[in-house]
Amino acid sequence: MFKVIQRSVGPASLSLLTFRVYAAPKKDSPHKSYMKIDELSLYSVPEGQSKYVEEPRTQLEENISQLRHHCEPYTSFCQEIYSHTKPKVDHFVQWGVDNYNYLQNAPPGFFPRLGVIGFAGFVGLLFARGSKIKKLVYPPFFMGLGASVYYPQQAITIAQITGEKLYDWGLRGYIVIEDLWKQNFQKPGNVKNSPGNK
């Protein structure tokens, strides 16, 4: 077995060796002219120039092309709506998953507090009998009152933010009313110079 391995390794190792070969043209041979690549038969160019001719469209292809052309504005509109609504839907789904996970691992005492806050909203709905405005105001007020008992820090933060927003809205409304008042109701001294009295 050793002899077989020795014989098979010998010729394989010789194939990896490199040898230099020195070759020179014979001095008495006549000088040959070289051929260009285009002159070789392998690279011959066909004599006739090929021309691409497009096949005429069939009636089905023409109808599909017209349908695609007419539907393009609608498809682009749908793609635009999809690109705008997909992040919002993903955000809403993630919000739902987060709330579900929170409710699955709720802190102790969360559900009794939630029941008291919901009951406060129901009591507000009972007190609001008769008036539609009371039905809109009383339940959120009672629920907010119940929530502020259990979550005072969050209630203070929400009250501050709400107060700032209400003040900002009131200031904007005052400015708008003041501008409208100045435009529509001028002082009595300016009545002579108004464009209507010429």
From Swiss-Prot:
Membrane-crossing residue ranges in chain numbering: 108-128
PANTHER family linked: MICOS COMPLEX SUBUNIT MIC26 / MIC27 FAMILY MEMBER
Signal peptide span: 1-23
Organism of origin: Mus musculus (Mouse)
Name of one Pfam family that matches: ApoO
Keywords: Endoplasmic reticulum, Glycoprotein, Golgi apparatus, Membrane, Mitochondrion, Mitochondrion inner membrane, Signal, Transmembrane, Transmembrane helix
Function: Component of the MICOS complex, a large protein complex of the mitochondrial inner membrane that plays crucial roles in the maintenance of crista junctions, inner membrane architecture, and formation of contact sites to the outer membrane. Plays a crucial role in crista junction formation and mitochondrial function. Can induce cardiac lipotoxicity by enhancing mitochondrial respiration and fatty acid metabolism in cardiac myoblasts. Promotes cholesterol efflux from macrophage cells. Detected in HDL, LDL and VLDL.
Glycosylation sites: N63
Self-association and partners: Component of the mitochondrial contact site and cristae organizing system (MICOS) complex, composed of at least MICOS10/MIC10, CHCHD3/MIC19, CHCHD6/MIC25, APOOL/MIC27, IMMT/MIC60, APOO/MIC23/MIC26 and MICOS13/MIC13. This complex was also known under the names MINOS or MitOS complex. The MICOS complex associates with mitochondrial outer membrane proteins SAMM50, MTX1 and MTX2 (together described as components of the mitochondrial outer membrane sorting assembly machinery (SAM) complex) and DNAJC11, mitochondrial inner membrane protein TMEM11 and with HSPA9.
Protein name per Swiss-Prot or TrEMBL: MICOS complex subunit Mic26
Source taxonomy: Eukaryota, Metazoa, Chordata, Craniata, Vertebrata
Membrane topology: Single-pass membrane protein
Entries under InterPro entries matching the protein: MIC26/MIC27 (IPR019166), MIC26/MIC27_animal (IPR033182)
Localisation per UniProt entry: Mitochondrion inner membrane; Mitochondrion; Endoplasmic reticulum membrane; Golgi apparatus membrane
